[in-house]
Amino acid sequence: MTKRVPILVVDDSKDDVFLLGRAFKRAGLEPSLIHVWDGEEAVDYLSGENRFTDRSRYPLPSLMLLDIKMPKQDGFDVLRWLLTRKDLGKIPVVMFSSSFEQEDVEQAKVLGATDYFTKPAGPEGFDQVVKSIATKWLASPK
């Protein structure tokens, strides 16, 4: 990759965020992973509000990886909010959740999610998810 693509990771699991970062490196990709803990922080980040006002430090992401079940605001709340923001509608949102319930997958798509991946059980699964994300949304992995 010639430039560091900003990817917003919205997830309350530091272990999953770590495994995602490691999987991107193992795939030969080094995007700029920007991590926020919940939907409320994601809305602040995307709006450029509170501590995220400086767009040179906090650029709009080229892709967002969004968990569903989080404190304060969940992923579905973020998707509903995004529907009201035409200026942010072009950011692809990939759901990355531990939920494999078909109802959650369908709800995410109805609310505008671009894709949906279930969180894998181990590091090798994260490698596969990242390769799929890279193939669809980023430069090709090694």
What are these regions (language model features)?
Residues 5-15, 20-25, 33, 64:
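Conserved acidic segment of CheY-like receiver
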Residues 41, 121-133:
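C-terminal output helix
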Residues 21, 35-63:
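Acidic, metal-coordinating helix/loop segments flanking the phosphotransfer/catalytic sites
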Residues 35, 72-73, 110:
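Residue-level signal for the "D+5" position in two-component response regulator receiver
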Residues 94-96:
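Hydrophobic/aromatic residues positioned on beta-strands within the core alpha/beta folds
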Residues 68-70:
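Receiver (REC) domain active-site loop signature in two-component systems and cognate sites
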Residues 114:
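Short, glycine/charged-rich "phosphate-handling" switch motifs in NTP-dependent
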